[in-house]
Amino acid sequence: MNSSRRKMLKSSALAAGGLCSCRILDLFANPSDCCNTPDLEPKSYTVEKDRVVVDLSAAPSLAHPGHAAFISVPEREIELIIVRPDPDSYVALSRFCTHGGQVLSYVRQRRLLQCNNFNHSLFELDGTVYKGPAPKPLARFRVEAAAGELTIYL
């Protein structure tokens, strides 16, 4: 009886260790779909005083769920990444990592934003840190999609 209990505990520990190892390896994996987020088509958006308005019919980089694009207007200090994770949803966040200020990319297969720096901080689409070393969440901006337009409130 003692030996079968020992076997069961040993087998359970090995199984749990295997599951943990897979999860740890996933966290540190270097996704192949990293670092290729395009800039949003310049003629597809206008910058107003307190918002950016995107004409979705003129923005093929956001045409399909799982796509993302950058908006960069340095003279207004606007640096965003827009992600369309699902057919009816969009998110807009700061495009720079809170650890070292490096550019982020959307990793579609994992539904995460990844820092393009060596440390690869990962962020959830709500801006929270999924894996550091990033010390704080990303700034998130309110978005509204209606009548073929996406409005991002700054």
Where are these regions (language model features)?
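N-terminal secretory signal peptides and thylakoid transit peptides that target proteins
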Residues: M1-C20
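Glycine-centered flexibility sites
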Residues: A13, G66-H67, G101, G127, ...
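Metal-associated gating/positioning segment near the N- to mid-region
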Residues: Q109-L113
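Exported/periplasmic cell-wall-interacting domains
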Residues: Q114, L122-I152
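His-Asp-centered metal-binding catalytic motifs of divalent-metal-dependent phosphohydrolases/nucleases
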Residues: N119
